[in-house]
């Protein structure tokens, strides 16, 4: 005999797909043609995109180029770095011609602090580099653990929807997957 638990009332109701109102104004072009092509037109407000790959392959450089290009169109963004100092990222941004007043930068790994920064800056795009460095102290496990990565990523999905912001998570491919 299998027991099930009820957890409150459903938060939504089924609807015919044609009756669903598109709250997102569609994708927002990044300014990088090839990235926009791969993403089907650009980043979608309220969504999360994962940029993954092996360490050293250029993920951080790519997302910084993306922010520089978006800033050229007046798009406010927030780059959250859990790996490099703000000075290191500024140096790379300078090299990539991505220095712009529309790009905000913070070195942070604590999930609640990142939420606060997103609310303060009110960006259209948030980059989190990398998801493996994030930490929610309430979970009690180490940063980079499967539990931390899963729960922090899920929390950022909720933040993306709540603030209607496009979130890009940078993730390293590891031997563990």
Model-derived segments and spans:
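Proline-aspartate-enriched helix->loop->beta-strand connector
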Residues: 116-128
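The Walker A/P-loop phosphate-binding site
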Residues: 5-96, 115, 119
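Long, basic/Gly/Ser/Thr-rich N-terminal segments
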Residues: 1-3
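Structural recognition of the conserved hydrophobic beta-strand(s) that form the central parallel beta-sheet
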Residues: 79-81, 104-106, 125-128, 165-172
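Conserved nucleotide-binding/hydrolysis micro-motifs of P-loop NTPases
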Residues: 55-57, 83-87, 95-98, 109-113, ...
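Substrate-engagement module of ASCE P-loop NTPases
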Residues: 147-168, 172
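Flexible beta-alpha connector loops of hexameric P-loop NTPases
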Residues: 24-26, 52, 78, 100-108, ...
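Conserved RecA-like P-loop NTPase ATPase core
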Residues: 35-38, 51, 89, 129, ...
């Amino acid at each position: 005999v299998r027991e099930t638990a009820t957890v409150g009332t459903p938060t939504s109701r089924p609807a015919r797909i044609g009756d669903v109102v598109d709250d997102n104004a569609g994708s927002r072009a990044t300014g990088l043609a090839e990235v926009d092509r791969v993403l089907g037109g650009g980043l979608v407000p309220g969504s999360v995109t994962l940029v993954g790959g092996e360490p050293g392959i250029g993920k951080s450089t790519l997302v910084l180029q993306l922010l520089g290009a978006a800033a050229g169109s007046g798009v406010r963004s927030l780059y959250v770095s859990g790996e490099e100092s703000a000075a290191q990222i500024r140096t790379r941004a300078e090299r990539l011609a991505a220095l712009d007043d529309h790009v905000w930068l913070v070195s942070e790994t604590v999930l609640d602090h990142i939420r606060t920064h997103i609310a303060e800056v009110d960006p259209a795009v948030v980059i989190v580099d990398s998801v493996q460095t994030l930490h929610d102290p309430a979970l009690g496990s180490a940063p980079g653990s499967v539990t931390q990565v899963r729960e922090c990523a899920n929390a950022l999905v909720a933040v993306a929807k709540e603030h209607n912001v496009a979130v890009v998570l940078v993730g390293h491919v590891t031997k563990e997957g």
